[in-house]
Amino acid sequence: QLGRHSVPAVACGINYAPEDIAQAVDTWHVDSVAFDMVMMISDPAVIKGGEFQVFQGTKQEGQSLLGIRGEEGRDSELPAERVTTVAFPGAGYGFLQQGNMIFHRACRLLEKVERVTLIPSFEVLPASSRDATNSINMLEWTDPGLEAELARREIWRAAARLNALLDSISIADDRGTLHRLIGDALEPLNSLRASLKEPRS
């Protein structure tokens, strides 16, 4: 089950083409959220360039070909036979993608024109479920209040996992099992807490 993302900075974003059309609209990258939608707001019939493309392979393979890692982007070319262009039939059309797994980009514009996309993001529910949002990566963003919102999110989801653990823990569980279960419930929150000690790079 998916629901609106609990972090306001990513719950719904708007992407604009850069003023300098020599720059890519968005370089090859993966997203910090597990699921998002890409919806074209502008009329694609009047846009030259700016194509949305996906790499036909794993994100690790695409990153290796470009010499990058993590979620950083790079404005380079991948083998054309490994790249698919996703067409938008008109304004208002879009698609849902597993953004943290699909290596994708939006190409440079060939002519200066408005190109606007709406990007709603989602997370897996209930809150006790596994969700691949990369809160650690998002700590590097500069949105006002984002660090507190990420902390709230991880506290909320950790509390949900602990509540689920209350119902599932067994009197037969040994020390090792209990240690693992508690650690699993707290790991994302503890990772964020540790990252908050480090200055933004």
What are these regions (language model features)?
Residues 1-50:
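Conserved double-stranded beta-helix
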Residues 131-201:
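Intrinsically disordered terminal extensions flanking catalytic oxygenase cores
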Residues 50-160:
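Catalytic core of Fe(II)/2-oxoglutarate
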Residues 24-38, 127-134, 197-200:
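Short, Lys/Arg-enriched charge-dense amphipathic segments
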